[in-house]
Protein backbone atom coordinates (compact mmCIF):
# COMPACT_ATOMS: atom_id res chain seq x y z
CA UNK A 1 0.00 0.00 0.00
CA UNK A 2 1.34 3.41 -0.84
CA UNK A 3 0.97 6.46 1.32
CA UNK A 4 -1.67 7.91 -1.02
CA UNK A 5 -4.05 4.97 -0.67
CA UNK A 6 -5.37 5.08 2.88
CA UNK A 7 -8.67 3.25 3.34
CA UNK A 8 -11.40 5.59 4.50
CA UNK A 9 -12.22 4.41 8.01
CA UNK A 10 -13.07 6.43 11.12
CA UNK A 11 -9.67 5.52 12.60
CA UNK A 12 -7.86 6.88 9.53
CA UNK A 13 -9.89 10.08 9.30
CA UNK A 14 -7.24 12.26 11.02
CA UNK A 15 -4.56 10.89 8.72
CA UNK A 16 -6.67 11.56 5.63
CA UNK A 17 -7.38 15.13 6.77
CA UNK A 18 -3.69 15.70 7.44
CA UNK A 19 -2.73 14.23 4.06
CA UNK A 20 -5.17 16.63 2.39
CA UNK A 21 -3.70 19.55 4.36
CA UNK A 22 -0.17 18.57 3.35
CA UNK A 23 -1.24 18.22 -0.30
CA UNK A 24 -2.75 21.72 -0.15
CA UNK A 25 0.46 23.04 1.43
CA UNK A 26 2.57 21.49 -1.31
CA UNK A 27 0.32 23.03 -3.94
CA UNK A 28 0.61 26.43 -2.25
CA UNK A 29 4.40 26.15 -2.14
CA UNK A 30 4.46 25.33 -5.85
CA UNK A 31 2.24 28.35 -6.57
CA UNK A 32 4.54 30.50 -4.42
CA UNK A 33 7.54 29.26 -6.39
CA UNK A 34 5.85 30.22 -9.64
CA UNK A 35 4.98 33.66 -8.26
CA UNK A 36 8.56 34.23 -7.09
CA UNK A 37 9.94 33.09 -10.44
CA UNK A 38 7.58 35.32 -12.41
CA UNK A 39 7.83 38.31 -10.05
CA UNK A 40 8.47 41.42 -12.11
CA UNK A 41 8.87 43.78 -9.18
CA UNK A 42 5.62 45.64 -9.87
CA UNK A 43 3.30 46.55 -6.99
CA UNK A 44 0.66 44.10 -8.29
CA UNK A 45 3.08 41.15 -8.45
CA UNK A 46 4.50 42.04 -5.02
CA UNK A 47 0.96 42.18 -3.61
CA UNK A 48 0.13 38.78 -5.14
CA UNK A 49 3.32 37.40 -3.60
CA UNK A 50 2.41 38.83 -0.18
CA UNK A 51 -1.11 37.40 -0.41
CA UNK A 52 0.27 33.95 -1.26
CA UNK A 53 2.77 34.14 1.63
CA UNK A 54 0.01 35.13 4.05
CA UNK A 55 -2.15 32.27 2.76
CA UNK A 56 0.75 29.84 3.28
CA UNK A 57 1.37 31.10 6.80
CA UNK A 58 -2.30 30.65 7.72
CA UNK A 59 -2.32 27.14 6.18
CA UNK A 60 0.78 26.17 8.17
CA UNK A 61 -0.72 27.60 11.35
CA UNK A 62 -4.02 25.80 10.78
CA UNK A 63 -2.24 22.51 10.07
CA UNK A 64 -0.15 22.85 13.22
CA UNK A 65 -3.09 23.66 15.50
CA UNK A 66 -5.41 20.96 14.15
CA UNK A 67 -2.68 18.31 14.28
CA UNK A 68 -1.91 19.03 17.93
CA UNK A 69 -5.36 19.85 19.31
CA UNK A 70 -5.65 17.71 22.47
CA UNK A 71 -9.40 18.39 22.76
CA UNK A 72 -10.29 16.96 19.36
CA UNK A 73 -9.66 13.20 19.16
CA UNK A 74 -10.55 13.23 15.46
CA UNK A 75 -7.64 15.47 14.51
CA UNK A 76 -5.06 14.61 17.18
CA UNK A 77 -2.22 12.86 15.39
CA UNK A 78 -0.20 12.00 18.49
CA UNK A 79 -1.84 8.57 18.52
CA UNK A 80 -0.07 7.68 15.25
CA UNK A 81 3.55 6.83 15.95
CA UNK A 82 6.03 7.24 13.10
CA UNK A 83 9.36 5.35 13.21
CA UNK A 84 12.36 7.67 13.42
CA UNK A 85 13.82 5.94 10.35
CA UNK A 86 10.85 7.08 8.27
CA UNK A 87 11.32 10.65 9.45
CA UNK A 88 15.02 10.42 8.54
CA UNK A 89 14.09 9.15 5.07
CA UNK A 90 11.77 12.11 4.54
CA UNK A 91 14.34 14.60 5.86
CA UNK A 92 16.91 13.15 3.45
CA UNK A 93 14.46 13.66 0.57
CA UNK A 94 13.81 9.95 0.11
CA UNK A 95 10.47 8.24 -0.38
CA UNK A 96 9.22 6.61 2.87
CA UNK A 97 7.73 3.77 0.80
CA UNK A 98 11.35 2.72 0.14
CA UNK A 99 11.79 2.29 3.92
CA UNK A 100 8.75 0.02 4.01
CA UNK A 101 10.03 -2.07 1.11
CA UNK A 102 13.52 -2.37 2.63
CA UNK A 103 12.04 -3.26 6.03
CA UNK A 104 9.99 -6.06 4.48
CA UNK A 105 13.00 -7.34 2.50
CA UNK A 106 15.21 -7.43 5.61
CA UNK A 107 12.54 -9.30 7.56
CA UNK A 108 12.01 -11.78 4.72
CA UNK A 109 15.77 -12.49 4.58
CA UNK A 110 15.90 -12.91 8.34
CA UNK A 111 12.91 -15.26 8.30
CA UNK A 112 14.49 -17.33 5.51
CA UNK A 113 17.75 -17.56 7.45
CA UNK A 114 15.93 -18.65 10.62
CA UNK A 115 13.92 -21.22 8.68
CA UNK A 116 17.17 -22.62 7.27
CA UNK A 117 18.64 -22.86 10.76
CA UNK A 118 15.52 -24.63 12.03
CA UNK A 119 15.64 -27.15 9.18
CA UNK A 120 19.37 -27.68 9.78
CA UNK A 121 18.83 -28.39 13.47
CA UNK A 122 15.93 -30.71 12.64
CA UNK A 123 18.18 -32.71 10.28
CA UNK A 124 20.95 -32.73 12.90
CA UNK A 125 18.47 -34.03 15.49
CA UNK A 126 17.28 -36.81 13.18
CA UNK A 127 20.77 -37.90 12.07
CA UNK A 128 22.19 -37.65 15.59
CA UNK A 129 19.21 -39.58 16.98
CA UNK A 130 19.63 -42.36 14.40
CA UNK A 131 23.35 -42.64 15.16
CA UNK A 132 22.70 -42.71 18.92
CA UNK A 133 20.11 -45.47 18.47
CA UNK A 134 22.58 -47.50 16.37
CA UNK A 135 25.44 -47.15 18.86
CA UNK A 136 23.41 -47.26 22.07
CA UNK A 137 20.27 -49.39 21.55
CA UNK A 138 19.34 -49.05 25.23
CA UNK A 139 18.75 -45.29 24.64
CA UNK A 140 16.29 -45.84 21.76
CA UNK A 141 13.19 -45.14 23.86
CA UNK A 142 14.62 -41.87 25.23
CA UNK A 143 15.86 -40.73 21.80
CA UNK A 144 12.46 -41.45 20.22
CA UNK A 145 10.79 -39.53 23.05
CA UNK A 146 13.04 -36.51 22.44
CA UNK A 147 12.40 -36.65 18.68
CA UNK A 148 8.63 -36.86 19.25
CA UNK A 149 8.67 -33.94 21.71
CA UNK A 150 10.72 -31.72 19.39
CA UNK A 151 8.63 -32.28 16.25
CA UNK A 152 6.82 -29.33 14.63
CA UNK A 153 3.39 -30.62 15.66
CA UNK A 154 2.14 -27.96 18.03
CA UNK A 155 -0.88 -30.08 18.98
CA UNK A 156 1.47 -32.94 19.87
CA UNK A 157 3.63 -30.58 21.91
CA UNK A 158 0.57 -29.26 23.73
CA UNK A 159 -0.59 -32.80 24.54
CA UNK A 160 2.89 -33.77 25.80
CA UNK A 161 2.93 -30.70 28.04
CA UNK A 162 -0.56 -31.54 29.31
CA UNK A 163 0.41 -35.19 29.91
CA UNK A 164 3.56 -34.11 31.73
CA UNK A 165 1.57 -31.69 33.89
CA UNK A 166 -1.00 -34.39 34.66
CA UNK A 167 1.74 -36.87 35.62
CA UNK A 168 3.37 -34.32 37.91
CA UNK A 169 0.05 -33.60 39.66
CA UNK A 170 -0.70 -37.26 40.41
Curated annotation (Swiss-Prot):
Q: What GO annotations for molecular function exist for this entry?
A: transcription coregulator activity
One of the GO biological process terms? regulation of transcription by RNA polymerase II
**Keywords, ordered alphabetically:** Activator, Nucleus, Transcription, Transcription regulation
Question: Which InterPro entries does the annotation name?
Answer: Mediator_Med10 (IPR019145)
Mainly resides where?
nucleus
Question: Would you name any one GO CC term?
Answer: mediator complex
Location(s) in or outside the cell: Nucleus
Tell me, how does this one assemble? Component of the Mediator complex.
Q: Which family does it belong to?
A: Belongs to the Mediator complex subunit 10 family.
Q: What does this protein do?
A: Component of the Mediator complex, a coactivator involved in the regulated transcription of nearly all RNA polymerase II-dependent genes. Mediator functions as a bridge to convey information from gene-specific regulatory proteins to the basal RNA polymerase II transcription machinery. Mediator is recruited to promoters by direct interactions with regulatory proteins and serves as a scaffold for the assembly of a functional preinitiation complex with RNA polymerase II and the general transcription factors.
Per its record, how is this protein called by name?
A: Mediator of RNA polymerase II transcription subunit 10
Gene that encodes it: NUT2
Amino acid sequence: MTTGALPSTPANEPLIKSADNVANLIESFIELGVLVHDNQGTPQSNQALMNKLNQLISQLSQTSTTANDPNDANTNLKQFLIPIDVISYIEDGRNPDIYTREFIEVNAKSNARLKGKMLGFKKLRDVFGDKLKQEFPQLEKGVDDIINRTNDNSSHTASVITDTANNNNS
